[in-house]
Amino acid sequence: MEADDFYIGTRAQGARGRGTEQQPMLAAVDRAPAGRGSCVIRCAEDCSGGSWRQFGHDHLCHASRIRADAWSGMTAGLSSFRGLEQKECDSSDGDASLPMVHRVISNFKAYVEGAFHGLSKKRLQSYADSCSWRYSHRSSSDACMELLHEMCLMHVPLSGIAATATVQPKLPASLPKPFTVQGA
């Protein structure tokens, strides 16, 4: 598992680095074999030990091996996790740079900044939950997920249909039958 913190949002005018108006976020990614795995992204008050302690309590397993950078807040917050391995970030060592969690963070930032064109702190946790859910279910073989995916692919954008058109997208013949309740 890899864990890291990051900030999202716009910087204050003229400010450099991590601006105070940015929202602190915490992220963890399960480095499961064969590309499967899950992630969790959470809004936090700050990136201190207290925030990491709560994040660890809610989302991490004490038996996990957690790879992280050498941030002191993480050291204090996750001190009860025996599998915590912290290293200084080294650009020459690809594994020490936490590639999985940084890829998820980068994809999350692109997702919210590209799809929503502006962030609302009020809705940011919902965006994080959506991104985490999509990442965690990206290779699901669940029948319900497959059906949902197929239905999304059948969607015809309104921009491609005239306002007065009554044409509906043709449903494929292979859609599963609806679920029925036994004894009803």
Region roles according to the model:
Residues 1-184:
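Residue-level recognition of single "structural anchor" positions
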